[in-house]
């Protein structure tokens, strides 16, 4: 069967109504080519430090992208058939071309999803492909992409510049020595790649590597991390080290948004229980909650912006986790409370405008009931954009609809791509800019905004707000 043409409609994601679409076109034209601010994500800094060629289409576009391979897994495709690394570091012996063929044969599974929007953008605009991916074009795609990746124009730094990325933030463990960021800074290359401090491995007593990570934390900092005061000093030391390597933010991926405000004596007793490995689930939750409040206090001193990504049941598929480890598509959103959960932290620091806490959610029911009213009141609180399971166009639209009344536009922070999939970054930002242009065009058409106001908001959402919120 002859493969169909791959094309990107210039009006994709813009309103169907002709009058509103015309407004959206004008708004989008003002933001389409703005530089990309990528203030939170999970790209590998080694790419930019070494500037080595990407290996092939499979290693770049399939293996790191759990948005994609989780969909294939849901249809019974074994992750070994795709060459996904296992928890022990080994991999099935799979020809990357064969893995790509499996992907291509099942590409229809992504129809209508944001992954298809992003990937088709990558195929069309980055690799200049003009036929759709399917079983019949799998080898053509694999050969074309893999050959392109070996050319100078597709080296990581060249793509960074081609994508018009002004700054990108990676995310590292407190145990990371940040040698790649140091190498980038020493290289003379002008691309700006900063890090972010994500202390989860030494904050979550239920993390499978917590005990070993805590030991490394002490060895790295020279602090006695088996005492509460020494543990906090170790965090301050590592935060300063990260800031010296460009960090402007921290990130916290907790099961809930719980915070606490224990006395030093209570915190020490709890910490003693944690380091003995004797913490109950409730004590582990209380410990994470207390550390969040301590991180907020540290942010008042060092100026790092806090990000909180709560409400995900990580590694829901125990068998998959045991075989393949974390970040393999088995993370599931949960109901999440914010009004009660954040109150201890907000009671202590919420009225201090020096604190900047950006809160995300996977529970859309909390947008208008809890998060928008909180962000519309506390000077320390900002709303992160539609995240993960909700960064589809529909999810972005719902976010705007449900937060605008109470939080406005200016208690939000623009867009985060939050991705490991480097080549999809322009596509993700383009989708966000189109959706915001469409949303603003509706407000103009309803005479709720003048078009010049909508233009200013569109530019703010695409560029100014993320720079401001993340101190970039």
From Swiss-Prot:
Share an example GO biological-process annotation for this protein. D-galacturonate catabolic process
Q: Which GO terms describe its molecular function?
A: glucuronate isomerase activity
This protein's UniProt keywords: Isomerase
Q: What InterPro entries does its record include?
A: Metal_Hydrolase, Uronate_isomerase
- Report the enzyme's class at the first EC level: isomerase
Catalytic reaction(s) noted? D-glucuronate = D-fructuronate; aldehydo-D-galacturonate = keto-D-tagaturonate
- Its annotated pathway? Carbohydrate metabolism; pentose and glucuronate interconversion
Q: Does the keyword Coiled coil apply?
A: no
- UniProt keyword Transit peptide present: no
Enzyme Commission number(s) of this protein: 5.3.1.12
Which Pfam families is this protein grouped with?
UxaC
Domain of life assignment: Bacteria
Disulfide-bonded cysteines = none
Which HAMAP family does this chain map to? UxaC
Recorded hits in PANTHER family, A to Z, give: URONATE ISOMERASE
Annotated family: Belongs to the metallo-dependent hydrolases superfamily. Uronate isomerase family.
| Protein name listed in UniProt | Uronate isomerase
Phylogenetic placement of the source organism: Bacteria, Pseudomonadati, Pseudomonadota, Gammaproteobacteria, Lysobacterales
Q: Which gene encodes it?
A: uxaC
């Amino acid at each position: 069967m002859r493969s169909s043409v791959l094309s990107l409609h210039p009006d994709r994601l813009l309103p169907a109504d002709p009058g509103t679409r015309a407004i959206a076109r004008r708004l989008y034209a003002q933001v389409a080519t703005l530089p990309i601010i990528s203030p939170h994500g999970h790209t590998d800094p080694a790419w930019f430090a070494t500037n080595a060629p990407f290996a092939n289409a499979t290693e770049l576009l399939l293996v790191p992208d759990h948005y994609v391979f989780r969909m294939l897994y849901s249809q019974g495709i074994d992750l070994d058939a795709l060459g996904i690394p296992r928890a022990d570091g080994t991999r099935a012996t799979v020809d990357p071309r064969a893995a790509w063929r499996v992907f291509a044969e099942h590409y229809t599974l992504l129809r209508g999803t944001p992954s298809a929007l992003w990937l088709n953008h990558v195929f069309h605009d980055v690799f200049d492909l003009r036929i759709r991916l399917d079983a019949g074009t799998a080898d053509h795609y694999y050969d074309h992409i893999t050959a392109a990746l070996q050319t100078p124009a597709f080296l990581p730094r060249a793509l960074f510049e081609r994508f018009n990325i002004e700054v990108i933030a990676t995310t590292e463990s407190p145990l990371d020595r940040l040698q790649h960021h140091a190498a980038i800074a020493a290289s003379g290359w002008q691309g700006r790649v900063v890090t972010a401090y994500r202390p989860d491995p030494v904050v979550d007593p239920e993390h499978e590597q917590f005990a070993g990570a805590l030991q490394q934390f002490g060895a790295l900092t020279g602090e006695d991390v088996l005492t509460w005061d020494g543990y906090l000093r170790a965090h301050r030391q590592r935060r300063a080290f990260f800031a010296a390597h460009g960090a402007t933010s921290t990130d916290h991926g907790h099961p809930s948004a719980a915070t606490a405000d224990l006395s030093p004596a209570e915190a020490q007793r709890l910490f003693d229980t944690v380091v003995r490995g004797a913490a109950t689930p409730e004590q582990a939750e209380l410990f994470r909650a207390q550390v969040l409040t301590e991180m907020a206090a540290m942010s008042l001193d060092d100026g790092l912006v806090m990000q909180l990504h709560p409400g995900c049941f990580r590694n829901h598929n125990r068998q998959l986790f045991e075989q393949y480890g974390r970040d393999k598509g088995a993370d599931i959103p949960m109901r999440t409370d914010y009004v009660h959960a954040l109150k201890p932290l907000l009671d202590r620091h919420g009225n201090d405008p020096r604190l900047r806490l950006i809160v995300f959610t996977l529970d859309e029911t909390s947008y208008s009931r809890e998060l928008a009213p909180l962000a519309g009141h506390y000077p320390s609180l900002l709303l992160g954009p539609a995240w993960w399971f909700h960064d589809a166009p529909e999810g972005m639209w719902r976010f705007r609809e449900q937060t605008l009344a109470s939080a406005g536009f200016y208690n939000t922070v623009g867009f985060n791509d939050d991705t490991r999939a480097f080549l999809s970054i322009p596509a993700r930002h383009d989708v966000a800019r189109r959706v915001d242009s469409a949303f603003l065009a509706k407000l103009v058409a309803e005479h709720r905004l003048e078009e010049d106001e909508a233009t200013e908001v569109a530019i703010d959402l695409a560029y100014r707000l993320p720079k401001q919120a993340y101190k970039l």
